[in-house]
Amino acid sequence: KQAKVVNLGMMYGMGVNKLADQLDVDVDTAKEITKQYHSRVPFVKELMSGVSRAVDQKDDGSIRSLKGRKCRFDMFEPLGYELKKALPKKEARAQYGDTTPLRRAYTYKALNRLIQASAADMTKQAMVDLYEAGERPLLQVHDELGCSVRDLEHAKKIREVMERAVGLEVPNKCDIDLGPSWGEAVEV
């Protein structure tokens, strides 16, 4: 569980105070965990920084999800000041003054937003593809779809459609859980 908290927390921009709280450790321990994580998995910090820089460099402060939807970062805060409220640019300029340098707020969350938006794109595309294949998903929760199926072979056909919904270099895999209800379903 702790490894999941650390890995997802780092990917999604969790700070040391939040990490300390989640792991029930002191802040110094959380700082050491963060340091060790980034030394062992350096590409995560590079990816986070790259996505954050991409947002900062765009005039409209946006990035696009896998299917092209815009993820906007349109709030601003004073550069170098902690705990100042992020505001739309005109309001930030009025609140903090014309001479105070501003930066885009929350860009540390850009990788999280990109991942979540792209996962939503994939799920939505799978729903469209299933509909076009004559299937009717009954329920969607995050990245899961609930369908009524006749048997395992029918479930496997649905899985094939879902796995092909978005072409990626790394194959997209789908799990199948079967049962009389969502709560009683077991992985097959």
What are these regions (language model features)?
Residues 1-188:
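Conserved catalytic core of nucleotide polymerization and phosphodiester-bond processing enzymes
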